[in-house]
């Protein structure tokens, strides 16, 4: 079966590999244009584009699927299209090109967490179980009928990056299985049912820690925004980046944002019990162990994160 693959970030690469390894004829790859990366802002191909080049697959770079891009998709003559985190909308004209439609791998148990950041939102909400589904792409936001489902436990210390890494591999296998079922004529798509929740894209402000929140909520937020956009707070008006924190129910009571060096542990007060910082990156410096940062302070007494 001839398949067009659409995807952009690293989490989509396992799916591209899975389709190639399963023997599908991947006729072209649709991905976002090269983007500036690093401090020097060097234009760099997306991870999917780089992998497609290694595999010798034609790459279609597009920030928007317009009439010209749709014509290129049609020229590739795919029987089906598989899409994983492409990062753009697929208009009706393009949806109609492959006879089997576009099969989307989405990293949540739809209709829960429809949108761009399902894994991050699941971690931030404290979900115990999440998963991935393959579904028939429609013009609505992640509304199409579901072909296949897998579940994945959310571990207590999971960051969204760690959870997404696991789902990217298990989901890749699910996507290949779904396309095989479609090719064999035995795939059945079932309408979504259950409570709908939305997972809008995260912004920088989603990573800001509000120390008046309970420790559990702060821990979930810090894990949910790691690695991107990252957790942060401010000290003396300067942004300070944080890695995920540990909950400390045995620690002495502190005011929200108040910092205390307790032995080798750096504690910060919250709306409930304190949390322990693991690693911290002050403005203009490299990420370091929280204890090393604390020892470098002239005095921690009176230090309060804002």
From Swiss-Prot:
Class in the EC hierarchy, top level: transferase
GO molecular function, one term: methionyl-tRNA formyltransferase activity
Role this protein plays: Attaches a formyl group to the free amino group of methionyl-tRNA(fMet). The formyl group appears to play a dual role in the initiator identity of N-formylmethionyl-tRNA by promoting its recognition by IF2 and preventing the misappropriation of this tRNA by the elongation apparatus.
Reaction equation(s) it catalyzes: L-methionyl-tRNA(fMet) + (6R)-10-formyltetrahydrofolate = N-formyl-L-methionyl-tRNA(fMet) + (6S)-5,6,7,8-tetrahydrofolate + H(+)
SUPFAM superfamilies, alphabetized: FMT C-terminal domain-like (SSF50486), Formyltransferase (SSF53328)
Binding sites annotated in the UniProt record for (6S)-5,6,7,8-tetrahydrofolate: 108-111
One Gene Ontology cellular component: cytosol
Signal peptide: none
Keywords associated with the record: Protein biosynthesis, Transferase
Family: Belongs to the Fmt family.
InterPro entries per record: Fmt, Formyl_trans_C, Formyl_transf_N, Formyl_transf_N_sf, Formyl_transferase-like_C_sf, Met-tRNA-FMT_C, Met-tRNA-FMT_N
Protein's name in the database: Methionyl-tRNA formyltransferase
EC number annotated for this UniProt entry: 2.1.2.9
Any one Pfam family match given in the protein's UniProt record, by short name: Formyl_trans_C
Species assigned in the record: Arthrobacter sp. (strain FB24)
């Amino acid at each position: 079966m001839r398949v067009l693959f659409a995807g952009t970030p690293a989490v989509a690469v396992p799916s591209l590999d899975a389709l190639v390894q399963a023997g599908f004829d991947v006729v072209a790859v649709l991905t976002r244009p090269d983007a500036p990366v690093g401090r020097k802002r060097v234009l760099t191909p997306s991870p999917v584009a780089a992998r497609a080049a290694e595999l010798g697959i034609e790459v279609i770079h597009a920030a928007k699927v317009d009439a010209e891009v749709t014509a290129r998709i049609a020229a590739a003559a795919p029987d089906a299209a598989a899409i994983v985190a492409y990062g753009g909308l697929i208009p009706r004209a393009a949806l109609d090109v492959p006879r089997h439609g576009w099969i989307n791998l989405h990293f949540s148990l739809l209709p829960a967490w429809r949108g761009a950041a399902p894994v991050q939102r699941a971690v931030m909400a404290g979900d115990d179980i999440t998963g991935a589904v393959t579904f028939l792409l429609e013009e609505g936001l992640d509304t199409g009928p579901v072909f296949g489902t897998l579940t994945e436990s959310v571990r207590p210390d999971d960051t969204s990056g760690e959870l997404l890494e696991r789902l990217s591999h298990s989901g890749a296998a699910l996507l290949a299985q779904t396309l095989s079922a479609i090719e064999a004529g035995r795939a059945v798509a079932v309408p979504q049912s259950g409570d709908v929740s939305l997972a809008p894209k995260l912004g920088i402000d989603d990573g800001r820690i509000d120390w008046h929140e309970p420790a559990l909520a702060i821990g979930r937020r810090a894990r949910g925004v790691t690695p991107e956009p990252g957790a942060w707070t401010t000290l003396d008006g300067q942004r300070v980046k944080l890695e995920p924190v540990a909950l400390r129910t045995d620690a002495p009571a502190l005011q929200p944002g108040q910092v205390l060096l307790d032995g080798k542990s750096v504690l910060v007060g919250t709306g409930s019990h304190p949390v322990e910082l693991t690693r911290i990156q002050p403005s203009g410096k490299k990420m370091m162990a929280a204890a090393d940062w604390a020892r470098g302070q002239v005095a921690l007494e009176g230090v309060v994160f804002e």
